[in-house]
Amino acid sequence: ICSRNRMTYSKVTAILEGDEALCREYAHLVPMLEDMKALAEILMQKRDRRGSIDLDVREAKIVADGENIEVSAYERTISHHIIEEFMILANETVAEFLAGYELPCVYRVHEKPSEEKAAGFRAYLQELGVKADFRPENVRPGEYGKILEKLEDSELFRVVNRVMLRSMSKAKYSAENGGHFGLASRCYCHFTSPIRRYPDLVVHRLVKLAIGGQAGEAEQMAAFVARAANESSNAERRADEAERAVDELYKVWYMRSHLGEECDAVVSGVAAFGVFGLGFAVLAAVK
């Protein structure tokens, strides 16, 4: 990695918003950052045209300082969008490269929602008075995306985001290319984070073999790639469960300091034991 400048999301956002002091300090980077912003906007428009779903379900940002816990919603800024768009394009390009040469690949697959879940989501929207005329047996990503666009300035936006996400299938790793529903992508993999995600590392090794004239050796890795995809999906599920458990502990500790307080919340689900509400940047069950 040839790192010329140690930049942060907040710095880049401030520069692109015209912070005079930072623009002077990083004057040599400003033209490139402006070009990156322009390119990211083009890529976002391109994804939007093909029907990609831009979910904005804000995860909780947890900051622990001893026994003091702060929970807030992660903020997505233009700098986050730039990196997101560039990563998506890189991941698609690499997946298409390996698929084009009929070489093995650990694909990132996101299947379309099941008919049952899509029908449940449509019924939920109809109860809210939101027009939803998609066919549950063959819903397309663009139809989900249009619903979010329609509700962008509505108080229903956050909760519909959350319920829409629950109606979708969970993404997984696979040796078979099944496309990515959420991104409306025909061919997708994880390539951009090999230092922290094993599937990315496997994909890097496959690309290295392919461009190094060792495509035959890459072809022989098909069985290994299938095992790597399966094990990575299983490991991801375990990691997600552990992360949720730890986050919930922090959120409970945070809410202890707000006992007895009232806050506005949005009901995002109903169960036999109570309701789920979004408030204090926390999704909680209320009995």
For the regions a language model picked out, list residue spans one by one.
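Electropositive polyanion-binding surfaces
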Residues: 1-282, 286-287
